[in-house]
Amino acid sequence: MEVRVANVRKEFERFPALHDVSLDIKSGELIALLGPSGSGKTTLLRLIAGLERPTRGKIFFGDEDASQKSIQERNVGFVFQHYALFRHMTVADNIGFGLKVRHGSSRPPAQEIRRRASELLDLVQLSGLEKRYPAQLSGGQRQRVALARAMAIEPKVLLLDEPFGALDAQVRRELRRWLREIHDRTGHTTVFVTHDQEEALELADRVVVMSQGRIEQVGTADDIYDTPNSPFVYGFIGESSSLPVKVENGEIWLADRPIGLSAPHAPEGEATLYFRPHDVELLDGCSGCIAGTVAASRRVAGTRRVELEIGGERQRVEIELPVGHPAAQKSRVAFRPGRWKLFPAA
């Protein structure tokens, strides 16, 4: 099922939570809505679900305008962060609940509901636990039950609101891989909300980066990480460092000296240079480079993060070195960014 969000604005008591947002989601696609708190990602998910109505604009499921339809009429499956399982029901009854409460001819026979629950238990790798209650399950198992319940109604669209947010890091990593496998097997159009960029980049076919009620960028993990289109995206996705620079005659200058980077197509004047801490070339001398005094150095897993003070204004940047690299022992380090991007000064 294709989903199209067309020029949607959402206000809460005149406070704009979304500003004229448009987004096309392809049938069978796994989409991540990624952003900090207050970015509008959960509001957008709830609008797609039918839990909220747009102040302006429309939401289409296929060619049909679903803007004023309820969540039941849209036939979406919704998975909450905190599972929302019924404590007094067994696993099998929780999974079959959405089918049991259907009315009239749309309600399957009890035998069909049991068959569907058993089939989904196999899919989510919980066979043999159908008679247990939620309190007898781990957090990861409860989230699998919640996903199976959402899929039981054979939804047109599957929506997940920070589905792994309440779980510890190891379980989250395992469930991410599992969810991707489930999606590839079932082919549901799936949209999930997360503030965890690693989760979004690993899982999604495309990532929608949001900030302050607007979409900043939509693209694959490679697009978002390697070619961010705004200072916000560059700073929000992955680790980054930045320096105020200026462009003169197609060359990038830091303070009163060129740093060996050419920008022939960049506009002249003040700009901000962004680069990744791990993507730098270390240099012995500094004829056309960036040099700084080591202000701090710390071990981060298999690397060493070095904080440098640059220039008279003591602008600070971070670079990343292998743990045993001799440059980490120096008081002064010279480098040049490998991949980088310029944005006009704010």
UniProtKB/Swiss-Prot annotation:
<keyword id="KW-1003">Cell membrane</keyword>
<keyword id="KW-0813">Transport</keyword>
<dbReference type="Pfam" id="PF00005">
    <property type="entry name" value="ABC_tran"/>
</dbReference>
<protein>
    <recommendedName>
        <fullName>Sulfate/thiosulfate import ATP-binding protein CysA</fullName>
        <ecNumber>7.3.2.3</ecNumber>
    </recommendedName>
</protein>
<feature type="binding site">
    <location>
        <begin position="35"/>
        <end position="42"/>
    </location>
    <ligand>
        <name>ATP</name>
    </ligand>
</feature>
<comment type="function">
    <text>Part of the ABC transporter complex CysAWTP involved in sulfate/thiosulfate import. Responsible for energy coupling to the transport system.</text>
</comment>
<dbReference type="InterPro" id="IPR003593">
    <property type="entry name" value="AAA+_ATPase"/>
</dbReference>
<dbReference type="InterPro" id="IPR050093">
    <property type="entry name" value="ABC_SmlMolc_Importer"/>
</dbReference>
<dbReference type="GO" id="GO:0005524">
    <property type="term" value="F:ATP binding"/>
</dbReference>
<dbReference type="InterPro" id="IPR027417">
    <property type="entry name" value="P-loop_NTPase"/>
</dbReference>
<keyword id="KW-1278">Translocase</keyword>
<feature type="domain" description="ABC transporter">
    <location>
        <begin position="3"/>
        <end position="237"/>
    </location>
</feature>
<dbReference type="InterPro" id="IPR003439">
    <property type="entry name" value="ABC_transporter-like_ATP-bd"/>
</dbReference>
<dbReference type="GO" id="GO:0102025">
    <property type="term" value="F:ABC-type thiosulfate transporter activity"/>
</dbReference>
<keyword id="KW-0764">Sulfate transport</keyword>
<dbReference type="GO" id="GO:0016887">
    <property type="term" value="F:ATP hydrolysis activity"/>
</dbReference>
<dbReference type="InterPro" id="IPR005666">
    <property type="entry name" value="Sulph_transpt1"/>
</dbReference>
<dbReference type="GO" id="GO:0043190">
    <property type="term" value="C:ATP-binding cassette (ABC) transporter complex"/>
</dbReference>
<keyword id="KW-0472">Membrane</keyword>
<dbReference type="InterPro" id="IPR017871">
    <property type="entry name" value="ABC_transporter-like_CS"/>
</dbReference>
<dbReference type="GO" id="GO:0015419">
    <property type="term" value="F:ABC-type sulfate transporter activity"/>
</dbReference>
<comment type="similarity">
    <text>Belongs to the ABC transporter superfamily. Sulfate/tungstate importer (TC 3.A.1.6) family.</text>
</comment>
<keyword id="KW-0547">Nucleotide-binding</keyword>
<dbReference type="InterPro" id="IPR008995">
    <property type="entry name" value="Mo/tungstate-bd_C_term_dom"/>
</dbReference>
<comment type="subunit">
    <text>The complex is composed of two ATP-binding proteins (CysA), two transmembrane proteins (CysT and CysW) and a solute-binding protein (CysP).</text>
</comment>
<dbReference type="InterPro" id="IPR024765">
    <property type="entry name" value="TOBE-like"/>
</dbReference>
<keyword id="KW-0997">Cell inner membrane</keyword>
<dbReference type="Pfam" id="PF12857">
    <property type="entry name" value="TOBE_3"/>
</dbReference>
<keyword id="KW-0067">ATP-binding</keyword>
